[in-house]
Amino acid sequence: MIIIVYLFILIMISLLVYLCTLNTIFCVIIIILTIIFLILLLMSHVKFEINRFDIVRYKIDKNIKIMLMSDMHNREISDRIVKAISEEEPDYIIMSGDMINESIKDTENFIKLLDRIDSDKIYYTFGNHEDELSETDKEEYYKILKKYKINLLNNKSVKLSNNIILSGFDIPYDFYKFMGKKITKKDMSEYLNKCEIDKYNILVAHNPLWNEYYKEFNYDLCLSGHVHGGMVRFPFIGGIFSPDYKFFPKYTKGKYKVGDMTSIVSSGLGYSKRIKMRILNPGEVVIINLLKK
């Protein structure tokens, strides 16, 4: 799929070059538009957003401020994250996966971040890149997380208050679409924790493209990433492409209603080694205020 995207871009560039040879005015317009595009592209890599959502529910018994971050992919972006944490002062920092790439050698910038923040506030669920680590690398990575006292949430639950339950969902790498193994509701039930209906249940699950499954397990709120905002974003259209090699993914960035469940998807902070692309799509962290009604 990504080859098709690049091929399409190459064809369009070739067409524009040909048209420029036919019309000088058209050529000037194309040059101006290209400069604007390059400026916007640069801003996508430099700019950093903080987006906010308030959630007010009867089942929430305590006001809690959460910072959601996802898909750092070991990018050197620590200064901006540390500044955001200092300014926002969240009660909890939730990391919904792919904070590193698929090798223990590709973790240094994430470790630098952990050196600079209050890591015992962090609740972390793995994404496909952590799950792709070799067994040896994964053992080493567990040691790093233990050293920094990270709360690893993979298929576990914790109480944030008397009535707010936070659960993590991690599933074997084989189930990601690019590996070809189709997931079922039965598969989900083996990994998802059971919800207490009278509690406010939050799920941290890397991949929002499975939202239709998550909602069947009575979660009130799902926090995700994975899709990188659709990589390329256009006004009124949204995200174009997902890491699962799918055009126009349904969930890319922001807040969605999926049945009775609310889904909040972070567009992430970086880009993977496989597809180094963010266009009109700056990195972000998300602030979620859980408020008593």
What are these regions (language model features)?
Residues N207-V286:
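Conserved beta-sheet core of the metallophosphoesterase superfamily
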Residues V56-M67, I150, S157-G168, I197, ...:
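Beta-strand-turn-beta hairpins that frame and shape the catalytic cleft
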Residues D91-Y92, Y123, I150-N151, I164, ...:
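Short, Asp-centered acidic motifs that coordinate Mg2+ and/or phosphate
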Residues K47-K59:
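Alpha-helical transmembrane signal-anchor/signal-peptide segments
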Residues S70-N74, G97-M99, N128-E130, K156-S157, ...:
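Active-site metal-binding loops of divalent metal-dependent hydrolases
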Residues K62-L153:
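Membrane-embedded segments
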Residues M1-E49:
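Non-catalytic terminal accessory segments
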Residues E139, K143-Y148, S161-N201, N211-E212, ...:
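Binuclear metal-dependent hydrolase catalytic cores centered on His/Asp/Glu-rich metal-binding motifs
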